[in-house]
Amino acid sequence: MSLLTEVETPIRNEWGCRCNGSSDPLVIAANIIGILHLILWILDRLFFKCIYRLFEYGLKRGPSTEGVPESMREEYRKEQQSAVDADDGHFVSIELE
């Protein structure tokens, strides 16, 4: 009994694979999953600091208002709104009659 597997069977005095050109959907799916896994692994190793920083600190936007009195929160909101209102002068308002 040979220790060679089916994939390692010598073909025409060369080592080759009998499954080349296989159109089996399971083989195609396995190849796609393998390629995606490799791509994700490479991206993970390249950008792991950025990725895990997002998980560590979350996707918070803007300053935290935790522990800030409500009066200061309202003052901050008014300042932000006044900054937005000041920019409205740059736009042209067209009114239809």
Curated annotation (Swiss-Prot):
Protein name (database record): Matrix protein 2
Main location, first listed in the record: virion
Subcellular location: Virion membrane; Host apical cell membrane
Residues the UniProt record annotates as site (Seems to be involved in pH gating): W41
Domain remarks: Cytoplasmic tail plays an important role in virion assembly and morphogenesis.
GO CC list: host cell plasma membrane; membrane; virion membrane
Annotated lipid attachment (S-palmitoyl cysteine): C50
Regulation of catalytic or functional activity: The M2 protein from most influenza A strains is inhibited by amantadine and rimantadine, resulting in viral uncoating incapacity. Emergence of amantadine-resistant variants is usually rapid.
Phosphoserine, modified sites: S64, S82, S93
Organism: Influenza A virus (strain A/Henry/1936 H1N1)
Residues the UniProt record annotates as site (Essential for channel activity, possibly by being protonated during channel activation, and by forming the channel gate and the selective filter): H37
Known glycosylation sites: N20
Summary of the function given for this chain in its UniProt record: Forms a proton-selective ion channel that is necessary for the efficient release of the viral genome during virus entry. After attaching to the cell surface, the virion enters the cell by endocytosis. Acidification of the endosome triggers M2 ion channel activity.
Domain of life from the UniProt record: Viruses
Biological process per Gene Ontology, one example term: symbiont genome entry into host cell via pore formation in plasma membrane
HAMAP family: INFV_M2 (MF_04069)
Name of the coding gene: M
